[in-house]
């Protein structure tokens, strides 16, 4: 009615409500519509490892981002998943305003392996809760250039995010540092290289890459924490790291209880360094 209203005002019949919306809202809507069109037009299909009405587990290749970043034209893993669900009639971004399919676990661009995505909000909440409670057991394979302290062990250290998207690791506690625990098991050794299975007992940014480098067994090809000289000598410029298995260690009496005990494996490790018999 031409007057500024308060939160407590109650509308009456024939009242006129005027909305004053920032121009940035319309610019965002325009960009969002363009993004929707890009997703709809993606023809690439995800490499599906497991799927049901609630979740989809896919294999992420190296060089692909999980989420959209600065490279607007490049399809991300979640874009490809959304496009696949759109083609199957399970998701329509132009009609769905309350929920968008979302990934539950993230991998670095050059890490390969299994990624879980939820098809609905209830499943997203439950999977995220499982992950927080360490009920989703994720194991990794990696090729390391260096020597592990033993064939099998559990290493503890302290972790802090640093500058330039790097993390710092130290042996003793200090201000701002949080404890990390990493379990490793050597599967095979060839010369100065080892194929290892890693179990994250805690899960922090770059934990595997930074912690293994700290104990003297950096991941081959890792440009942030690895041995640059060795990487260059063998021509390996992306980390040889794969999230190769997921196990649902959950109770069977919850909404996603049918997943209890289910174990999934990546179809391949995707390593560019050969020589190891990876199954």
Pin down the residues of each PLM region.
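Beta-strand-rich interaction surfaces with strong enrichment in secreted/lumenal proteins
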Residues: 8, 185-186
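Pseudouridine synthases involved in rRNA/tRNA modification
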Residues: 23-24, 41-46, 164, 168-169, ...
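RNA pseudouridine synthases
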Residues: 2-163, 272-276
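Short strand-turn-strand beta-turns centered on an Asx-Gly dipeptide
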Residues: 1-2, 215
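Short, surface-exposed secondary-structure edge patches
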Residues: 6-10, 197, 238
